[in-house]
Curated annotation (Swiss-Prot):
Subunit structure comment from the entry: Interacts (when phosphorylated at Thr-186) with pin1.
Protein name: Wee1-like protein kinase 1-B
Compositionally biased intervals (Pro residues): 111-122
Coiled coil (UniProt feature): 526-563
Binding site for ATP: 254-262, 277
Similarity field: Belongs to the protein kinase superfamily. Ser/Thr protein kinase family. WEE1 subfamily.
Keywords from the UniProt entry: ATP-binding, Cell cycle, Cell division, Coiled coil, Kinase, Magnesium, Metal-binding, Mitosis, Nucleotide-binding, Nucleus, Phosphoprotein, Transferase, Tyrosine-protein kinase
Gene name per UniProt: wee1-b
Residue numbers bearing the Phosphothreonine modification: 186
Function field: Acts as a zygotic negative regulator of entry into mitosis (G2 to M transition) by protecting the nucleus from cytoplasmically activated cyclin B1-complexed cdk1 before the onset of mitosis by mediating phosphorylation of cdk1 on 'Tyr-15'. Specifically phosphorylates and inactivates cyclin B1-complexed cdk1 reaching a maximum during G2 phase and a minimum as cells enter M phase. Phosphorylation of cyclin B1-cdk1 occurs exclusively on 'Tyr-15' and phosphorylation of monomeric cdk1 does not occur.
Regions of compositional bias (Polar residues) in chain numbering: 1-17
Entry EC no(s): 2.7.10.2
Amino acid sequence: MNVQPRNMNVQPRNMNVQPVRHKLFFSDTDEEEEDGHSTGEDSAFQESDSPVSRQREKQEGKPPGGTWEELEEEEGFGSSPIKSPGDFFMSDSPSYRQLAPASPTRSPQGPTSPIPECPGTPPHKTFRKLRLFDTPHTPKSLLSKARGIGSSALRFRGGTLFREAEKAPKPEFVYSTPQVNINPFTPDSLEIQSSAGLCRGRKRALLNDSCGEDMEGSDCELEDEDIRPAKRIPITESNMKSRYATEFHELEKIGSGEFGSVFKCVKRLDGCIYAIKRSKKPLAGSVDEQNALREVYAHAVLGQHPHVVRYYSAWAEDDHMLIQNEYCNGGSLSDVISENYRTMQYFTEPELKDLLLQVARGLKYIHSMSLVHMDIKPSNIFISRTTLPNTAVEEADDEECGSGKVIYKIGDLGHVTRVSSPQVEEGDSRFLANEVLQENYTHLAKADIFALALTVWSAAGAEPFPTNGDQWHEIRQGKLPRVPQLLSQEFVDLIKLMISPDPEKRPSSVALVKHSVLLSASRKSAEQLRIELDAEKFKNALLQKELKKAQIAKAAAEERAHFPDRIATRSTTQNNRTTRLIGKKMNRSVSLTIY
């Protein structure tokens, strides 16, 4: 393709200098390469750090990257416009006659151009849209472009600079996609994943139909980044300062488990006490990383409930996961059971019913979110000895928000999974239901009921449960071990029903919170409490009426008692007056008033 050069007359600012003809040559792009001809290295632009440009700069006596004026004014790619020769020769650069032969000419080493080169700045999308390097299409160029797109190799126009930019790593601030975790326990996670699949399908169709269209390489990259699914952020070392040391003051270590250790800390800002769980070993890339993230996901979805340990925040430091939770001043149920076993003092039946009812309410809330805990046991039940206000959280009609002295809360949500798409991580085998061991995940909520029954039975004084063996199988067959206290038969029957070998026969968490055994003695339903309250209010209203009547009668009696004394006092005063001080010559008026 032949392009006729066009002469451009430039009038210099110095009137003593003769005008010069500045020739512009256009080189072929890589789209019109002939077999055995140029490979596109002689394009309009060249990388400043390439060996060819460095050699040319040394021969011409230029500093790397262009003239000294260009280096002073350079602020980004395309920020310095193409200057006329007169603009170059008005500065402190060499004279016009010395640099006149250096105007752009066709040389074996490639063309030179006064356009400043800036290797550190990536080509901008808006700069490409100017199409400064496009040439009229020929049938051969269109066919070659169609073949390039069909082979999924989108080629850049513009020569070496853009091909090198394609190979170079893309800056994070240009096409970076926000990396966020997708919470698997939220309903939106399914919509996000499905929408990502639809976007990928649309992109494939777009690439197949784009052979005859003029597509920009940068646009394709940007679209690919937009529809790419979000990547999971691993637990890696943070660049920030230690948040644990900056925001919290550690008081003591209050527990240790398989995951890590729990510390009692005071937040420096608000002065409140929190429980911060820190993993024992780095979790990045380990098996426990998924469990740690699952616990954070579950806490974030569940929010606040009086019978679930409250979650505040979580972060990673030095590849360790830290979770800030509510501090329960009563410790765990496992600690209380161990102390009771040592002192031979066990939970009474009313206390066992209270424990069962409160934990069942927590499970009801978790199950209502289509989640299951899968690791209910005494060490994951925490005790708070503070009284909850009656306006804390709205419960069901038959549930009481809590006015007792002890509040039981469910914690350690590392094994929580979704009912619809379970990813079961087996918990403690001592409290594990048999169907879960057999990988039957159709009744996962009933597995939590099974574990709750054994937890309550352990608080009643039962021996530590086995991890396997004949006794383990006997319990899965519905046989409870003996306890060192006498319990009512109806309560024992409820516990046996909760560990039934058939998961369908076990009561649900909703049925447990309404069970008559749990609401008979120590607990009353909200409806019963309302009836009793209305009766007391009616009695109180009657008593107030009687009190008002008594007060009125007493006031009337006192008034009648003082009435004769006032009459006698007035008559005596009138008799003692024989003369009048004023109006002696006037007749006294007669009044019929008693006073």
